[in-house]
Amino acid sequence: ISKMQNPRILRYLIENTTDESIIRLAKEKLKFKPLSAQEEAMYQGIVNFKNIQGLGGFNDAIIREAEAKLRDGGTYTVHNPDFLTGANISVTLTNEFMHAVENDLDFELRFPDVANYSPEEMAIYNEEWHKVGDVREWEKLGHGVRVYRTIKARELWNLINICATYAAEPGIFFIDNANEMTNAKAYGQQVVATNPCGEQPLAPYSVCNLAAVNLAQFAIKDSKTVDYEALRQTVKVGVRMQDNVIDATPYFLEENKTQALGERRVGLGVMGLADLLIYCEKEYGSEEGNELVDEIFKTIAIAAYEASIELGQERGSFPFLQGETAAETARLREAFVNTGFMKKMPQHVRDGVREYGIRNSHLLTVAP
């Protein structure tokens, strides 16, 4: 609500929400300026031309706007329209929250009870919370947690969806799904955050350089097919380039540098999908279109991991996958090939990691 810049949506929330806090916050964000007597007379004068031939030189849009101003009695805008405009926000949603949404249950909004922490507890919070990032895990560790309020899950779900639809924010991030699939589990880490646009789940202090393959370049227009071999080669060049970027990057925090060099995370994605579908005469969302998209992304995923395995042979695996002994390295590699994501990869890719290791902990990211 604090980032909403559309007064019409704020008014919709006020009129269609039953949660008192949402209504209060929407009202606080909404700004109303009543019409002066002069403005009211001006708009009324415009409306008076509504039923006169030629509309007095005004068009329908101007007359409708004048009617709306008179109906509302003023102009709606928002307070602090520039609030956090330079930041993208995502909301982490848990399985428990989605269960509450599906079953129309109440949901507790919980957070560490920092207001009642002792100085010692606050020091632990400042040092450790960002590494955990999950109030459920924080509570399991024995730290104090407070229920700040209870809300109907569907009210919050509807708020998120309305704001995302009409303001492109917040992003929706299913954190339990991310942790079930992430390769970071192999080396004892977990997802606690995302990058600004929400496409890259991140462990504490993780950073990830991003790149995109232009899919439109791989359409064979005469045959309306895809040049998969050229796509594979481009992906492999892209992975090699991004691995080089990791070493060429200036890091502002030592923790970022340690994490970046330790897991060597890269995010290769795509652009130009719509153009490719047009060139191949496939409709977006159709069965044929979806089959083509599946094949394209399967090709990219396999090629990227094959390239990283080759780099692992040349340059060594990412350090977090290297143990102090051969047995420890083998254990880490086995854990890696059994993450939620890697279980979906072809057997030859998993076997390649077991035998040669892999240069990068993560490889694929499609930006929104």
Q: Residue ranges of each PLM-predicted region?
A:
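Contiguous, well-ordered alpha-helical segments that form the cores/surfaces of helical PPI scaffolds
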Residues: 212, 264-279
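Internal maturation/activation junctions in enzymes
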Residues: 112-118, 234-257, 261, 283-368
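Structural helix-adjacent loops and short alpha-helical linkers that scaffold large soluble proteins
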Residues: 222-232, 282-286
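Short coil-to-beta-strand
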Residues: 205-211, 237-240, 271
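Active-site cavity-forming subdomains of large catalytic enzyme subunits
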Residues: 1-215, 219-228, 251-255, 304-325, ...
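Short glycine- and Lys/Arg-enriched binding-loop motifs that mark or flank ligand-binding interfaces
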Residues: 164, 184, 263-265, 366
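Structural motif
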Residues: 201, 260-265
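A general alpha-helix detector
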Residues: 159, 272-276, 292, 307
